[in-house]
Amino acid sequence: MFFSGLISKLHVHGTKRTNHFTIFHRLNHFVTTSSSSVTPLSPQDRNKLLATLLSNCTSLARVRRIHGDIFRSRILDQYPIAFLWNNIMRSYIRHESPLDAIQVYLGMVRSTVLPDRYSLPIVIKAAVQIHDFTLGKELHSVAVRLGFVGDEFCESGFITLYCKAGEFENARKVFDENPERKLGSWNAIIGGLNHAGRANEAVEMFVDMKRSGLEPDDFTMVSVTASCGGLGDLSLAFQLHKCVLQAKTEEKSDIMMLNSLIDMYGKCGRMDLASHIFEEMRQRNVVSWSSMIVGYAANGNTLEALECFRQMREFGVRPNKITFVGVLSACVHGGLVEEGKTYFAMMKSEFELEPGLSHYGCIVDLLSRDGQLKEAKKVVEEMPMKPNVMVWGCLMGGCEKFGDVEMAEWVAPYMVELEPWNDGVYVVLANVYALRGMWKDVERVRKLMKTKKVAKIPAYSYASTTF
């Protein structure tokens, strides 16, 4: 209350339109002027007040301005402790600027300020966000030297780091080193396995956690229900549903866990159960609506998905990029070409959302399935980012369906460049030649596969890939 009250005083003194510069200079006045009617602040209180000022920032630009003021005031040099550095880093992370957070950490190290048990988890998170796993491993060495390895926040951070890097043995090693591990470490290992598509292992870890006597929280349940959805195990889904009900509390909003149940049942093919949960929810957010739309689309319920999207807009809920992946996927499954084009254009024109690879993949897939291969090619050529193998694969699938040799020969080199080890493109190209009775070319492709020693991948087709 003291700090929030002082911030209010800093705002009301003087002009109405007080900006952060005015606040900062008044703060220095309160600290440095002994004749002030306000009791001068101690360095510790001043740092806490600056931390409060940072936490109240509503934009990245404001964080940068306050950081600049703090830097120019030389406060960080006068009081070389990690507290204020940590709060600056935390503010950058909160405003999705991990590179700035890392730069602050490097500045702290150059200033010979030792990181504390709160510093490292922030920088680990930043390193994970930009996939700088080399920096992450260096931070692990720092944690070992400073004796922070057993700290629960450092521990969970390193588990997440190694999982993201695909180094699951190292993640498990960090996890196993502490027999008194906390819930955060369990959540990190379960979440890491889930994101890596190792659903069975994630569920096994969840069972082990329950046996250890720890109760799951909403983060645990979101990860394990996602793993269950990946497995499509309805029996397990029912058991996890019970766990979610047990994990809910009156004090805590249950919207995250209920959204995870909608997603889980959708992936298990039970949209009736997903719909029941959705209808019973006291509160819904964009994730709730998007999970329903994506679920309907994945299960081939095109009309239901689009009706859900209509209702979402009617309720005034602003769609996000994931919402449009579901909407466009529904159009693909329903063969609704014109509607798909309209929704694709709507992303930018109505909601100022820049389409990503998944959205471009959907529209290319939609056009290719309809035989509009030239228009699909035009979309690919005009993409603002480099097409990935799935986008090329959708176009190649259309070539196979309609026997377009010229287009298939144009697409094939791009796919081979991206995945030279994959035989899928060769198989589809051979199929296109076979459809046109070009048997010499079919044989040429087969010989090329032998020459390049391309691995045979059974039952794989780019054309069947969905988003």
Swiss-Prot record:
Entry keyword set: Mitochondrion, Repeat, Transit peptide
Compartments in which it is found: Mitochondrion
Type E motif: region residues: 391-466
Predominant cellular place of this UniProt entry's protein: mitochondrion
Domain of life according to the entry: Eukaryota
Keyword Secreted: no
Interval spanned by the transit peptide: 1-30
Keyword Secreted: no
Annotated GO CC locations: mitochondrion
Repeat region (PPR), residues: 81-115, 116-150, 151-181, 182-216, 217-251, 254-284, 285-319, 320-350, 356-386
Family the UniProt entry places it in: Belongs to the PPR family. PCMP-E subfamily.
PANTHER family per UniProt: (WILD MALAYSIAN BANANA) HYPOTHETICAL PROTEIN, PENTATRICOPEPTIDE REPEAT-CONTAINING PROTEIN
Protein name in UniProt: Pentatricopeptide repeat-containing protein At1g77170, mitochondrial
Source organism (scientific name): Arabidopsis thaliana
